[in-house]
Design a protein with these regions (language model features):
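P-loop NTPase motor domains
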Residues: 1-180, 184-187, 242, 246-252
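Flexible loop/turn segments at secondary-structure boundaries
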Residues: 52, 114-117, 155-158, 197-200, ...
Length: 273
């Protein structure tokens, strides 16, 4: 039952776009000459996909009992994404312009999303859209450059645990591959996290430059220390770093170096224009 759920959702999404006049194969809208002029009418929203999903399930002739199980499982899960803060972000006719956002200083705060899985979902959706926008801009301008800072990255790029769903493993693997891919499009991804041991191994491997501040937990010191060629003695020294000190390593270096920032950053300074 679980195995067929993604295919039902995929069919519902495709049908929802077809209902709005889209030819999926040609990427053209049959109802409007220029659908981008009126996007609110030419693209389905989350609640419309849910209604289509009900029709898709009913069309499969699963039998009453199995149909009710599918509806109860899928609809209840997805309907939650149309409520509250998630609903305002996902179940909407208009969206923020990601391409315009690339040329501005933008902070996206997800504090109002209390559930960890919801934060993971939104981070994944945003990162995916940013990556596509970066690719598009780089095609027009090969000198295009952009920086994205991903804070608390373990929410999205956590190390898969034994017994976890295969979908999460695939998601982590996909975004790990994305990290390695976007560099050639002028994108710089900065991943900040206080618990490196929670990050997927692909993330630690695919980052070019690593800056390590004081770490106390042994598993964290070994997780990051192994990726920057630290000896056991050097890993133990990570507990002794002072404020403003860090261990820095970049690809191609023979060994990591210890650095100290002369002047601490003043976080009370005026905002940057």
């Amino acid at each position: 039952m679980e195995a067929s759920m993604p295919y039902l959702i995929e069919e519902a999404i495709v049908r929802s776009y077809q209902d709005k006049g889209w030819d999926i194969n040609q990427n053209e809208n049959l109802f409007y000459d220029n659908p981008w002029e009126n996007p609110s009418e030419c693209f389905p929203i989350f609640s419309e996909v849910l209604e289509t999903l009900k029709d898709v399930i009913a069309s499969k002739n699963f039998g009453r009992e199995l149909q009710e199980k599918y509806e109860g499982s899928l609809i209840s899960r997805l309907d939650n994404s149309t409520l509250g803060a998630k609903g305002k972000m996902l179940n909407t006719r208009t969206s923020i312009n990601i391409k315009e956002m690339l040329y501005k200083k933008v902070v996206i705060e997800l504090e109002d999303l209390r559930d960890e899985q919801d934060k993971c979902l939104m981070m994944g959706l945003l990162l995916g859209r940013i990556a596509e926008a970066v690719k598009h801009e780089h095609k027009k301008n090969h000198n295009f450059q952009h920086i994205t800072l991903l804070e608390e990255a373990h929410r999205l790029l956590s190390k898969p645990q034994a017994g976890e769903e295969g979908s999460k493993r695939l998601g982590v693997e996909m975004f790990g591959n994305l990290l390695a891919e976007v560099r050639k499009y002028g994108e710089c991804l900065i991943i900040a996290d206080q618990i490196p041991n929670k990050l997927a191994p692909e993330v630690l491997k695919n980052t070019n430059t690593k800056i390590v501040h004081r770490l106390f937990a042994s598993d964290d010191r070994h997780a990051i220390g192994d990726t920057i060629r630290l000896s056991d003695e050097q890993k133990d020294f990570l507990t002794m770093l002072q404020a403003g000190e860090a261990i820095v390593y970049s690809a191609g270096w023979h060994e990591a170096v210890r650095v100290k920032i002369d002047k601490p950053t003043d976080t009370n300074a005026p905002e940057i224009d």
